[in-house]
Amino acid sequence: MRSLLLHLSESKRLAPLMMKNPVSRRVARRFVAGDNLDDAVAAARGVNQARQTASLDMLGENVTDEASARRSAENYLAIFDRIAQERLEANVSLKLTQLGLDLGTALCEELVGKIVTHAARYSNFVRVDMEGSAYTERTLGVVKRVRAQHENVGTVMQAYLYHTEQDVRELLEIGCRIRLCKGAYNEPPTVAFPQKSDVDANYVKLMKILLPSGIYHGIATHDPAMLQATKEFAREKQIDREQFEFQMLYGIRTDLQKQLVREGYRLRVYIPYGTDWFPYFMRRLAERPANLTFFLRSLVPRRS
Ligand code: FDA
């Protein structure tokens, strides 16, 4: 089911149907702050009031023309302006295929460079999300080259990939900030652990490499076992709560989000917004069978 949903998340036919459907729009709102930047700002304000920080993500991926890539970049510049105007405790997450990675690395690198330079004026930070494994090497190349000019950019490492440990070690050598997650795409067993238990074990292994590195990393998960392992390891190694942050997605396990803050941990909430929510929404359905059941039930009209 997970593979099927992830496969469908790339469907160019299903996307417009789902995006027009009022029920899927309503269910998607559980995971997406709204259609526009005002909605994201309102969500970030709420998150900040709850003593959490935010990362704003303008949804969109795999643009097919240069004009769209340039428009996305302009939007990201405006997001940093707005974060500063509103005095939000927030940074930005973005995807390279939204900035033209499918059209060529040079265009994408130029646009990321502009965004990171703009963010640096506000002493703010850009997180480059990690997409499917076909993009990993190119993403790392762009991040490393842009980071050589401005240090306020980091990326994401996915525990399900066999190659991640080596990539993590290389990023640590240059001092790069990393968000550790399990990985959300459909990957073959030639590149990724097929078993969840192996992904979880690798997640813990990687967390134990990241935390003592002296670099500020994000431990992104809703999994109580991963949270517990991180807390225990930090305690054992006397790693201060200010030296890393937990990260979770908007609308997911808000009970755990509040609990972490109560316990004195730093928590950043990833806030996606925009009209292009279909692939993001499908990945969230794929992560949890109960989400799919809820969605399918919502589609069936209730008898009065
Ligand atoms: P796991 O999937 O084992 O879930 C543990 C528990 O969390 C579940 O039992 C359930 O209670 C809850 N949960 C998890 N997903 C849920 C959902 N969709 N709905 C409801 N409950 C859910 N991936 C990627 O490939 N590239 C990236 O750049 C990012 N970026 C990113 C940022 C942040 C802040 C987070 C938290 C996650 C990502 N991800 C990501 C997604 C990540 O790879 C992964 O798919 C999800 O976080 C789910 O994995 P968990 O670690 O939560 O564990």
What are these model-predicted stretches?
Residues 1-304:
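Positively charged, amphipathic and often flexible ligand-engagement surfaces
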